[in-house]
Design a protein with these regions (language model features):
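Hydrophobic transmembrane alpha-helices and immediately adjacent juxtamembrane helices
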Residues: 1-244
Length: 244
């Protein structure tokens, strides 16, 4: 089964990749880059915002699935756009609550203030929320298409993007072929921009521009795919089987 395969191969592989790149980063740049704690705590808080944004969409969908309400939901006059709007609003509320809690804990336990990022913090957060939406809608479409066997993707899919999001290390640590993939990931540009602000104070205009453009294109594409998935599942009667 997919959960067993992921337990045996997926999570150990991701752990190896993430910690391997972090180790390379620390080994190569320890003498050049001060304040690793500043980078890591800031990155952790921002990453959790992306994760909660994605969870707000996928978990909302799974709750309808577990309640066996999926068929009734999409057989009603409810439009796919209204469903997405509601789940996106839920994700924003989750992000708001979790960010306040994490920022407060970081300040209380480590005297770390996320506001040191300055005026760029809000654009960073907004872009990460949109990236979370993209992953969430994509994951929801997969679960709708392939059924409950794919439920595990609600928690695991987002972490597939973590190595190429360059959360805890700069993009240049990655192999060249993986850097090319990371460049297509909006989150990677946000975390690169965060490190630029904390290390030099320079405005991350280029990083934000890339993130906004990529988020816009990917969001339009993934919403279009969601619409097609809903239509396909209705035509093939998959909503009945998914909800059972």
């Amino acid at each position: 089964s997919l959960p067993r395969i992921m337990e045996i191969f997926y999570w150990p592989f991701l752990d190896l990749v993430i910690w391997g790149f972090i180790t390379l980063y620390l080994a190569r740049y320890q003498s050049q880059v001060p304040g690793f704690v500043t980078f890591f705590l800031g990155a952790l808080i921002l990453w959790d915002m992306l994760f909660r944004s994605q969870q707000g969409i996928t978990i909302s969908f799974l709750e309808e699935l577990w309640a066996r309400n999926l068929m009734n939901l999409f057989a009603s006059p409810l439009k796919p756009s209204e469903f997405l709007t509601a789940t996106m609003a839920m994700s924003v509320m989750k992000v708001a609550v979790v960010s306040i809690v994490m920022a407060g804990c970081a300040l209380l336990f480590y005297s770390y203030n996320i506001l040191i990022v300055g005026v760029w913090l809000m654009p960073f957060i907004l872009n990460l929320v949109v990236t979370g939406w993209i992953i969430g809608v994509f994951t929801t479409s997969l679960i709708m298409r392939f059924g409950q066997e794919a439920e595990v993707l609600a928690w695991s899919m987002v972490f597939l993007f973590q190595p190429i999001s360059c959360v805890f290390y700069p993009m240049e640590v990655l192999p060249e072929w993986l850097q090319m993939i990371a460049l297509a990931n909006p989150a990677a540009h946000i975390f690169e921009g965060m490190r630029t602000v904390l290390a030099t104070g320079a405005p991350p205009v280029g990083n934000l521009a890339w993130a906004v453009c990529l988020n816009g294109a990917l969001l339009v594409g993934v919403i279009a795919w969601f619409y097609r998935t809903v239509a396909y599942c209705k035509d093939q009667g998959l909503l009945v089987r998914v909800g059972e």
